Design a protein with these regions (language model features):
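Electrostatic cytochrome c docking/interface patches
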Residues: 34-66, 81-84
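Detector for the c-type heme attachment site
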Residues: 20, 72-79, 107, 158, ...
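Alpha-helical membrane-anchoring segments
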Residues: 68, 76-78, 86-88
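Short cysteine clusters
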Residues: 15, 69-72
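Extracellular and select intracellular beta-sandwich modules with Ser/Thr-enriched
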Residues: 23-28
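Structural detector for helix-capping/boundary residues
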Residues: 67-68, 151
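Extracytoplasmic electron-transfer domains, predominantly the class I c-type cytochrome c fold
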Residues: 1-15, 40-56, 88-200
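Short, acidic/hydrophobic/Gly-rich beta-strand patch recurrent on exposed beta strands
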Residues: 31
């Protein structure tokens, strides 16, 4: 039988919470990866931000993100047209003072504090039923357009409180000083949502 040292040397246990006090789920995903696959995972998380190409739907989505989402959500490396870094301010807008960092979002399997799957059902089953030899590659491939759980992600962007009530209407929470207790309904148009989804798909 393999020694405890050998087992420890072979795997790395990754615990992904990606949540704040305001939209956390008790759900957790524990993933065992070989040392080589773990190194790939780390390398991917350290990749610098790449802005979408000009005149693309994703580029328009980046603009929507800057105008609507960065009040709470950080994407590391994002810059405005003048070169200044885009810095989220959840401490100014959230009761908890924190919100999920969305850098490399599509390298994850879930969103909204692990409440909803980013992968659609067929792709999720393909990953989580894979044998040990192929699991690493499937898991690390992340989420692409064909595998994205479009229904839940679009629904979340359209009206998050309807999917996961979180007292996100500051008008009803005078004691918070107008700060959110979760993801609010931002009043996005369907065109905004289309652009945002295209942009979020680039965050791998």
């Amino acid at each position: 039988a393999p020694s405890r040292h050998r087992i420890t040397d072979y795997i790395q246990i990754l615990l992904w919470s990606n949540c704040s006090n305001t939209n956390a789920s008790t759900s957790r995903k524990n993933v065992a990866l070989s040392k080589a696959d773990f190194a790939k995972r780390v390398a991917n998380q350290l990749k610098p931000y790449t802005t979408p190409a000009e005149n693309t739907l994703a580029k328009e989505g980046e603009t929507v993100f800057m105008n609507q989402c960065v009040r709470c959500h950080q994407v590391n490396g994002m810059k405005r047209a003048d070169g200044t870094p885009v810095i989220a301010a959840p401490d100014e807008n959230m009761v908890s003072g924190a919100a999920p960092n969305l850098s490399h979002l599509m390298s994850r399997n879930t969103f909204a504090g692990a409440t909803f799957d980013l992968l659609n059902k067929s792709c999720r089953e393909d990953v989580w039923t894979a044998d040990s030899e192929s699991f690493g590659d499937k898991y690390l491939s992340g989420v692409n357009e064909d595998c994205l759980n479009q229904k839940d992600l679009r629904g979340w962007l359209r009206n998050a409180p309807a999917m996961k009530p979180m007292y996100a209407n500051p008008a009803l929470l005078t004691s918070t000083g107008g700060k959110y207790r979760g993801m609010p309904n931002l009043g996005l148009t369907e065109a905004d949502i289309e652009k945002l989804v295209a942009y979020l798909l680039t965050l791998k």
